[in-house]
């Protein structure tokens, strides 16, 4: 299975993202420019649902129509509040908020006890972002909605972990949902992370006394490498500029704070039998270390695609990593059934310097035929409990190493169930330990 190189796409555009003119009409009886609390709340929700996409269009799978991001935000406000805001008003509001965020960030950076080089890098990073990116990055920390509750003691026993689906409304980890209009009006759902991998969300102001990065122990990150995004998807192209996309699983970029709790721990020995035990297996890798590089991700996969597949459907995987070091990484992905390796794909990726950090992207890597056939067969099972029974013995092990030194940088064990949520794919992350 050949390595798949990444080709850069156009970067996210500015806040103005034009679409059809259908919403540029009268403003009901609401004064133009007045953003009441209910409008502002709906605006913030929509920012979290629809990531910046430049001048590209988004297709709603249940309608098949193309929309610019700002028009989708305007539609969302109308549907939630009954009040009209045009896409141009949305664009203007985004720019006003972005200028405010820039001023706040500049004041905060200048007041910190940092050397001038660090201050300059932070300000340059901000300057390289569009208004839409700045506002969307900051909305991840908005205070409108508390985080959704996470299921507790999922791993209290091995059997409980493998057989118990989470309670409705408690599937952990937010994920992209492009069908917000079916949701109840209140309470609102937790904000959902952007899915585009072309920018890194604006980081919170770091603590001067911090000895480790804010993302370590709170995200999938070792001392050498951090996973920024991971997704497996099916895509159908409508024409050269538009496509419909369905996410089976997705880990979006996050913006952790030092106040966030560390990841829950799971004993790695609980899952040894789910992965190969021979040379290069999970047990041998963990004994080799380093221990802070090992993570478990439980996915609740979304198989409810409404997209017509057809012969031109593309099944792929994209992932993105970042590091303070420039190196060449090797990414091994092993698909396992009943603890035995079925197929393996090894890809090589090189560093790209972006905003003071080295970024590694594996973009639209084609799925192997085994995986595509597996998904097709799984979707045709009549009941979800049957799907989960099959998935109980299906796992994926991803191992990222330095190609030159062979050092283990990151190991992620993926396990799966089928999502029962109307909000699409969900996930929860654990760190693997050995007490």
From Swiss-Prot:
<protein>
    <recommendedName>
        <fullName>Transcriptional enhancer factor TEF-5</fullName>
    </recommendedName>
</protein>
<feature type="compositionally biased region" description="Basic and acidic residues">
    <location>
        <begin position="14"/>
        <end position="28"/>
    </location>
</feature>
<dbReference type="GO" id="GO:0055059">
    <property type="term" value="P:asymmetric neuroblast division"/>
</dbReference>
<dbReference type="GO" id="GO:0045944">
    <property type="term" value="P:positive regulation of transcription by RNA polymerase II"/>
</dbReference>
<keyword id="KW-0010">Activator</keyword>
<dbReference type="GO" id="GO:0000978">
    <property type="term" value="F:RNA polymerase II cis-regulatory region sequence-specific DNA binding"/>
</dbReference>
<dbReference type="Pfam" id="PF17725">
    <property type="entry name" value="YBD"/>
</dbReference>
<dbReference type="InterPro" id="IPR016361">
    <property type="entry name" value="TEF_metazoa"/>
</dbReference>
<feature type="compositionally biased region" description="Polar residues">
    <location>
        <begin position="1"/>
        <end position="12"/>
    </location>
</feature>
<comment type="function">
    <text>Transcription factor which plays a key role in the Hippo signaling pathway, a pathway involved in organ size control and tumor suppression by restricting proliferation and promoting apoptosis. The core of this pathway is composed of a kinase cascade wherein MST1/MST2, in complex with its regulatory protein SAV1, phosphorylates and activates LATS1/2 in complex with its regulatory protein MOB1, which in turn phosphorylates and inactivates YAP1 oncoprotein and WWTR1/TAZ.</text>
</comment>
<dbReference type="GO" id="GO:0000785">
    <property type="term" value="C:chromatin"/>
</dbReference>
<keyword id="KW-0238">DNA-binding</keyword>
<feature type="DNA-binding region" description="TEA">
    <location>
        <begin position="28"/>
        <end position="104"/>
    </location>
</feature>
<keyword id="KW-0007">Acetylation</keyword>
<feature type="region of interest" description="Transcriptional activation">
    <location>
        <begin position="173"/>
        <end position="435"/>
    </location>
</feature>
<dbReference type="InterPro" id="IPR041086">
    <property type="entry name" value="YBD"/>
</dbReference>
<dbReference type="GO" id="GO:0007565">
    <property type="term" value="P:female pregnancy"/>
</dbReference>
<feature type="modified residue" description="N-acetylalanine">
    <location>
        <position position="2"/>
    </location>
</feature>
<dbReference type="GO" id="GO:0061629">
    <property type="term" value="F:RNA polymerase II-specific DNA-binding transcription factor binding"/>
</dbReference>
<keyword id="KW-0539">Nucleus</keyword>
<feature type="modified residue" description="Phosphoserine">
    <location>
        <position position="148"/>
    </location>
</feature>
<dbReference type="GO" id="GO:0005667">
    <property type="term" value="C:transcription regulator complex"/>
</dbReference>
<keyword id="KW-0597">Phosphoprotein</keyword>
<feature type="region of interest" description="Disordered">
    <location>
        <begin position="1"/>
        <end position="34"/>
    </location>
</feature>
<dbReference type="GO" id="GO:0035329">
    <property type="term" value="P:hippo signaling"/>
</dbReference>
<dbReference type="InterPro" id="IPR027253">
    <property type="entry name" value="TEF-5"/>
</dbReference>
<dbReference type="Pfam" id="PF01285">
    <property type="entry name" value="TEA"/>
</dbReference>
<dbReference type="InterPro" id="IPR038096">
    <property type="entry name" value="TEA/ATTS_sf"/>
</dbReference>
<keyword id="KW-0805">Transcription regulation</keyword>
<keyword id="KW-0804">Transcription</keyword>
<dbReference type="InterPro" id="IPR050937">
    <property type="entry name" value="TEC1_TEAD_TF"/>
</dbReference>
<comment type="subunit">
    <text>Interacts with YAP1 and WWTR1/TAZ.</text>
</comment>
<dbReference type="GO" id="GO:0003700">
    <property type="term" value="F:DNA-binding transcription factor activity"/>
</dbReference>
<dbReference type="GO" id="GO:0006357">
    <property type="term" value="P:regulation of transcription by RNA polymerase II"/>
</dbReference>
<dbReference type="InterPro" id="IPR000818">
    <property type="entry name" value="TEA/ATTS_dom"/>
</dbReference>
<dbReference type="GO" id="GO:0000981">
    <property type="term" value="F:DNA-binding transcription factor activity, RNA polymerase II-specific"/>
</dbReference>
<dbReference type="GO" id="GO:0005654">
    <property type="term" value="C:nucleoplasm"/>
</dbReference>
<dbReference type="GO" id="GO:0048568">
    <property type="term" value="P:embryonic organ development"/>
</dbReference>
């Amino acid at each position: 299975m050949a390595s798949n190189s990444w080709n850069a796409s156009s970067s996210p555009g500015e806040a103005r993202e034009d679409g059809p003119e259908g919403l540029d009409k009268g403003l009901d009886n609401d004064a133009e420019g007045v953003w009441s609390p209910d409008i502002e709340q709906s605006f913030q929700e929509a920012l979290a649902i629809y990531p910046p996409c430049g001048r590209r269009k988004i297709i709603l799978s249940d309608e098949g129509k193309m929309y610019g991001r700002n028009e989708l935000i305007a539609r969302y406000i109308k549907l939630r509040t009954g009040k009209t805001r045009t896409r141009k008003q949305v664009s203007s509001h985004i720019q006003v908020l972005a200028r405010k965020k820039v001023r706040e960030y500049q004041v905060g950076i200048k007041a910190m006890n940092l050397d001038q080089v660090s201050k300059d890098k932070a300000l340059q990073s901000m300057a390289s972002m569009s208004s839409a990116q700045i506002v969307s990055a900051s909305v991840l920390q908005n205070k409108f909605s508390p985080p959704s509750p996470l299921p507790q003691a999922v791993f209290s026993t091995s059997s409980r972990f493998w057989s118990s689906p989470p309670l409705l409304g408690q599937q952990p980890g937010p994920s992209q949902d492009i069908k917000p209009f079916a949701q109840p009006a209140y309470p609102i759902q937790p904000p959902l992370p952007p899915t585009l991998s072309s920018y890194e969300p604006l980081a919170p102001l770091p603590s001067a006394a911090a000895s480790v990065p804010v993302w370590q122990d709170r995200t999938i990150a070792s001392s050498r490498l951090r996973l920024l995004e991971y997704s497996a998807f099916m895509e159908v192209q409508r024409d050269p500029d538009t496509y419909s996309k369905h996410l089976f699983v997705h880990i979006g970029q996050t913006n952790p704070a030092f106040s966030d709790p560390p990841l829950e721990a799971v004993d790695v020995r609980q899952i040894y039998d789910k992965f190969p035990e021979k040379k290069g297996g999970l047990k041998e890798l963990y004994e080799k270390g380093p221990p802070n590089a090992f993570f478990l991700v439980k996915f609740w996969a979304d198989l409810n695609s409404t997209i017509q597949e057809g012969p031109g459907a593309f099944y792929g995987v994209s992932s993105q990593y970042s590091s303070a070091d420039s190196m060449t990484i090797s990414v091994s992905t092993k698909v396992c059934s009943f603890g035995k390796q079925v197929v393996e794909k090894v890809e090589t990726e090189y560093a790209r310097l972006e905003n003071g950090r080295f970024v590694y992207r594996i973009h639209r890597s084609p799925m192997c035929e085994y995986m595509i056939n597996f998904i097709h067969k799984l979707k045709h099972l009549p009941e979800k409990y049957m799907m989960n029974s099959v998935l109980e013995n299906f796992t994926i092990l991803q191992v990222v190493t330095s190609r030159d030194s062979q050092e283990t940088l990151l190991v992620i064990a993926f396990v799966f169930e089928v999502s029962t949520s109307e909000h699409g794919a969900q996930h929860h992350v654990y760190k693997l330990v050995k007490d």
